[in-house]
């Protein structure tokens, strides 16, 4: 049995199924590059048969990412599997992940199939997938609520057909650690050919036990792959959190006895990127990546940490990518210094054009804000990278406001519509409301505002504001993000970014869950 734990990240597939977390192809590519930089073993880049957009994203990521295995989900039918294989053609290392439900409830109510039909479809699906790659994963959806004898029968058959990874899905988060761990152990013991495959765990967090169940599957059950997402992103209560799994196994190697090959210093930067793109803010007390994860307010704790860090810290903040807020550049800093700092932060841009645009944004910010922090630089680069890769139907130009006590504020927004400048003016219940009304008065998108959120990127009154706007139209939900020291300007940028995503519509098939 290998002493390495394989990390399978499904942020781009299962994580994206969280309502409001839909990502564009360009955003998926940015996250995939960060995951590769982190040395994630397997990246599930999407569900190729769900939409042309997902197919294109998988195909592009497969061509760009060379150091991680790229995976596509596929239902247990030839059409889905063929689509996955086509999307994965450019990959250095490709995996097809096929699945079918095996619980009595799912077979009867959802699939309307008999156990024998499910057995045959699972077996034939793996056989067909093996025509394209030797790396085939099979998941029995709702495996934790499946009949044990039937589950053993199905898994023995798919391993015989060539499945190299068997993923035990706790699809609805029903499992508890001891029972789930013993389920994985029992399957490995009872299935005669279980030694021919790596067993994997995939847990949801409906009862708050996704990480605990996954770790039990590893320790008790002998699983050697964990399926997880950055920040625990996922539908309902989310998925197993990658950062918590990795740091638990790494910090408690004395207990788990396993190695993880990830560069953990990339955890926090990747967490921040996913949070910014999806608009899902990380709670301050979230383990590993929360803002308070390494903060000590108690005087006793502070005294202990000052004397010896290991009195109250079992991990080092810098080991997961936390950096202290420090002034790094100023208005007199040149392009080379800016580029050098990007390299030190592990931030890459795809072209000199993007670098030049980011540098100009930096110089503009330095004229308006006396102290520039690493977080400011990362926010600038992230937004410029997104703008460079997105097709901008609308583009923010300028904003002016007027308000007086006792009167409704008025906003005037200038923005480009396919290269032609238009001006919108409106009043509202506040400056942000007036700004959105001014934009909407010219655009007439008919969208509904679902979320408006503001976060300070750094500390102090000069901090840049990062605004997330979530819009909904015709059942489609998109996020837009904008940053600026002026919160209202950041709001306008975020609203326009969301409108651009609505304009580039990609209809996606709602996949079955694993």
UniProtKB/Swiss-Prot annotation:
The keyword Glycoprotein does not apply. Transmembrane segments: none annotated. Residues 5-268 form the Pyruvate carboxyltransferase domain. Mn(2+) binds at residues 14, 202, 204, 239. Its cofactor is Mn(2+). Keywords: Amino-acid biosynthesis, Branched-chain amino acid biosynthesis, Cytoplasm, Leucine biosynthesis, Manganese, Metal-binding, Transferase. Its main location: cytoplasm. It catalyses: 3-methyl-2-oxobutanoate + acetyl-CoA + H2O = (2S)-2-isopropylmalate + CoA + H(+). It is an enzyme of class 2 (transferase). It comes from the Bacteria. Pfam families: HCS_D2, HMGL-like, LeuA_dimer. Pathway: Amino-acid biosynthesis; L-leucine biosynthesis; L-leucine from 3-methyl-2-oxobutanoate: step 1/4. Catalyzes the condensation of the acetyl group of acetyl-CoA with 3-methyl-2-oxobutanoate (2-ketoisovalerate) to form 3-carboxy-3-hydroxy-4-methylpentanoate (2-isopropylmalate). Belongs to the alpha-IPM synthase/homocitrate synthase family. LeuA type 1 subfamily. Homodimer. This is 2-isopropylmalate synthase. It comes from Burkholderia ambifaria (strain MC40-6). The gene is leuA.
């Amino acid at each position: 049995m290998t002493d390495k734990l394989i990390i399978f990240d499904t942020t781009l597939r299962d994580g994206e199924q969280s309502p409001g977390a839909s990502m564009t192809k360009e955003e998926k590519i940015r996250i995939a590059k960060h995951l590769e930089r982190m040395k994630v073993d397997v990246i599930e880049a999407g569900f190729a048969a769900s939409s042309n957009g997902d197919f294109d994203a998988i195909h592009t990521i497969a061509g760009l990412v060379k150091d991680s295995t790229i995976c596509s989900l596929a239902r247990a039918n030839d059409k889905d599997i063929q689509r996955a294989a086509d999307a994965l053609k450019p990959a250095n290392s490709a995996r097809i992940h096929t699945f079918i439900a095996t619980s009595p409830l799912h077979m009867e109510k959802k699939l309307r199939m008999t156990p024998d039909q499910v057995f045959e479809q699972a077996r034939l699906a793996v056989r067909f997938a093996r025509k394209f790659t030797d790396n085939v994963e099979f998941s029995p959806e709702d495996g934790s609520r499946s009949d044990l004898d039937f589950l053993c029968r199905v898994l023995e058959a798919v391993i015989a057909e060539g499945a190299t990874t068997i993923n035990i899905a706790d699809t609805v988060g029903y499992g508890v650690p001891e029972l789930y761990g013993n389920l994985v152990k029992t399957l490995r013991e009872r299935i005669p050919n279980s030694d021919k495959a790596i067993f994997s765990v995939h847990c949801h967090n409906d009862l708050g036990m996704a990480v605990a169940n996954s770790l039990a599957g590893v320790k008790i059950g002998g699983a050697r792959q964990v399926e997880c997402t950055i920040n625990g992103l996922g539908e309902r209560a989310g998925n197993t959190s990658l950062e918590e799994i990795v740091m638990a196994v790494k910090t408690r190697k004395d207990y788990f006895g396993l190695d993880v090959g990830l560069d953990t210093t990339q955890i926090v930067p990747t967490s921040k990127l996913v949070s910014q793109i999806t608009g899902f803010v990380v709670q301050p007390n979230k383990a590993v990546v929360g803002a308070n994860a390494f903060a000590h307010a108690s005087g006793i704790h502070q005294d202990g940490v000052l004397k010896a860090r290991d009195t109250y810290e079992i991990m080092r903040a810098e080991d997961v990518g936390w950096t202290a807020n420090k002034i790094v550049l100023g208005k007199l800093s040149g392009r080379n210094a800016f580029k050098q700092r990007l390299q030190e932060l592990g931030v890459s841009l795809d072209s000199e054009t993007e670098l030049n645009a980011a540098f100009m944004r930096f110089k503009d910010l330095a004229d308006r804000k006396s102290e520039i922090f690493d977080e400011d630089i990362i926010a600038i680069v992230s937004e410029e990278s997104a703008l460079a890769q997105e097709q901008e139907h609308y583009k923010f130009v300028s904003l002016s406001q007027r308000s007086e006590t006792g009167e409704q504020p008025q906003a005037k927004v200038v923005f480009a519509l396919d290269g032609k400048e238009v001006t919108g003016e409106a009043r509202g219940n506040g400056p942000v409301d007036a700004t959105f009304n001014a934009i909407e008065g010219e655009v007439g998108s008919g969208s509904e505002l679902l979320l408006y959120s503001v976060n300070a990127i750094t500390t102090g009154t000069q901090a840049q504001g990062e605004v997330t706007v979530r819009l909904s139209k015709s059942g489609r939900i998109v996020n837009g993000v904008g940053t600026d020291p002026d919160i209202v300007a950041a709001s306008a940028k975020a609203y326009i970014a969301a409108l651009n995503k609505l304009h580039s519509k990609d209809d996606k098939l709602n996949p079955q869950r694993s």
